[in-house]
Amino acid sequence: MGKIFGNKMKKTITIFLLLMSVMGFSQTKITAVKVGDRIDVTINKFFFTSYLFAKNEKYPFFYPVNGPSGAGVTSMRNGIWPHHSSLFFGSDDVNGGNYWNKALSGGQIVSTREEIVENNGPRLVIENDCIWKRPDAPAPIQDFRKITITAPTKDIFQIDFEVTMEMLMDVSIAKTNHSLFSGRMDPSLSVDFGGTMIDADGVQGEKGTYGKPSPWIDCYGKRGDKIEGMAIMQHPSNNWYPAPWFTRDYGFFSPTPLNWPKDDKETLFKKGEKIHLKYRVLVHSGTHETANIAGEFKKFAAEK
C-alpha cells in the first residue's frame, strides 16, 4: 500500500513540476534595449542576440545569435569569406551596385529608422526601414523590415524576418549567389567540422543541397556534450518559393533564387514593384528531429 501511495505521489510531483515548467515558460519575457547603433535582445534575462545597424557596416545584421546553451551558433568576420556577417539580408549586382560585400562606396544598406514597437512580453517586435544607396548613383531600393522574436520552448528561440523591397526605379539584379537572406554558422557546427546540413527531403551537405529547392535547411553540430543549430525557413507566400539554396559545407546557407534567373543572366523589376519575403529562423537545441523542424515548418506555412 505504501509503495503504491509512494508511486502515485512521485507521479503527482512529476506532473506538477512539468506543469510549473510549462507555465513558467509561457510567461516568457522578451526584452529589447536600444544602445547606440544596436538593439540588444534578452529572453528571460538570457542574452539572445543583437541587431546591429551601424553606419560603418555594409548592412544591418544579427550578431551574436546565441543558442539555448548560451554559445553562439553563427560567426562574423570569419577567416573564410569575412563579409559573411552572421545572419543578414543583402544583394550583389543591383544596378551595378554591391550591397553584399567589399567597400561601402560600392553600395550600402543604411538603416533610416529602428523602432521597438512591442516589448517586455512573450514576443518582441522591431521595425526597421532601410535605403540601398551608393555615392553618385540614385538609390535603387528601399526596404521595410519587421522582426518578431519569440521563444516557443526553452529549447527553441525564433526570429521571424519579414521584408518588403520597394523598387525606386527599374532594377536589374545580375545573376548572383550573393543575394537575400543568409546565415553563416559557427565553424564548429559546420559540415567541415562534423556537423550536419539537411533539407526538408533529408538530403545532406553542400553536394546534395546546392541549387536544390527546399522549404527549409537546418544546420547543427555537437560542441562538448551539447547539440545546437539553426534552421532557416521560407514561407510559401514568398516569390520564387521554394527557392533553390546556395550552400557551403563551411557553414553558409541561403535560399538564393537570384542565382538561377530564367534567362541565366538577370532578374528584372519595374519601378514601384514590391517584393514581400518572409523567413523564419529557429535557433535550437538538438537535431532536426528532436527540434521537430519539419513540424515547426508546418506551423509556419499555415500562418498568413
Locations of regions flagged by a protein language model:
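Positively charged n-region of N-terminal signal peptides that target proteins for export
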Residues: 2-3, 7-12
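Beta-strand elements of well-folded, non-transmembrane domains
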Residues: 69, 130-134, 147-151, 165-169, ...
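Acidic (Asp/Glu-rich), glycine- and aromatic
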Residues: 54-57, 61-64, 152-197
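Beta-strand-rich N-terminal accessory domains
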Residues: 27-82, 286-288, 294
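Extended, loop-rich substrate-binding clefts of extracytoplasmic carbohydrate-active enzymes
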Residues: 86-155
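Sec-dependent N-terminal signal peptides
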Residues: 12-22
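Beta-strand-rich recognition/accessory modules
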Residues: 231-304
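Active-site/ligand-binding surface loops and adjacent short beta/alpha elements
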Residues: 170-173, 177-242
